[in-house]
Regions:
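Alpha/propeptide regions of enzymes that mature by internal proteolysis
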Residues: 1-8
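Long, compositionally biased non-active-site segments enriched in small/hydrophobic residues and glycine
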Residues: 18-183
């Protein structure tokens, strides 16, 4: 845990185990102390009231030690609660990757090199699983193309392999939803 004090790069999470059987997590970053930082608007550079006021002290940084669930995983997801008093970011990855990792670990509750390789190569999309269930509830109104899409999605195993018809249909619809929703 103390080794992280001297290692800091943007967005790095360190998960460790020690010789006493402890497992832990620490962010290996220097978090600047910033006033009014909880949004993405640019700040006027000539106004010193927005200057950084140093960095969050190591002993006030978030950490995790020996969680009850028995393992620690991160996947660029939000790793801190809303009660953490310093602003880190409001740009976190979707929780779908961490949910998938946690699901795989919980299903096995053991690890070895082969299992770690399997997790690294896993192509199952937790996000697609959530979204496709909603898409399949939509009505086609007799549209042949929509019926074909429904059929492909209803048979899809949520594996996003390069040759997957289900992945192609899902991403086409998902991108159209984003474009039609946000422009």
């Amino acid at each position: 845990s103390n080794a992280v004090k001297t290692f800091s790069v943007p967005g790095q999470n360190i998960i460790y185990a020690d010789i006493n059987g402890n497992i832990g997590w620490r962010p290996a970053v220097k978090i600047p102390i910033r006033k009014n930082a909880k949004n993405l608007l640019p700040r006027p550079g000539e106004d010193s009231s927005y200057d950084w006021e140093g960095f969050v002290p190591f002993n006030e940084m978030p950490f995790l030690l020996n969680p009850e669930k028995g393992f620690i995983a991160t996947a660029n997801n939000k790793t801190i609660g809303d009660s953490f008093p310093y602003y880190i970011s409001n740009q976190w990855a979707s929780p779908s990757r961490i949910k998938r990792i946690e699901q795989m670990i919980m299903d096995r509750m053991f690890t070895n090199v082969d299992f770690m390789q399997e997790m690294q190569m896993d192509q199952k999309s937790h996000l697609a699983l959530e979204i496709v269930n909603h898409l399949l509830q939509t009505k086609s109104n007799g549209n042949e193309l929509i019926n074909k899409g429904h059929s492909i999605l209803s048979e899809w195993d949520f594996i996003e392999s390069p040759d997957s018809k289900g992945a192609l249909v899902y991403h086409y619809i998902f991108n159209a939803l984003l474009k039609n929703t946000y422009g």
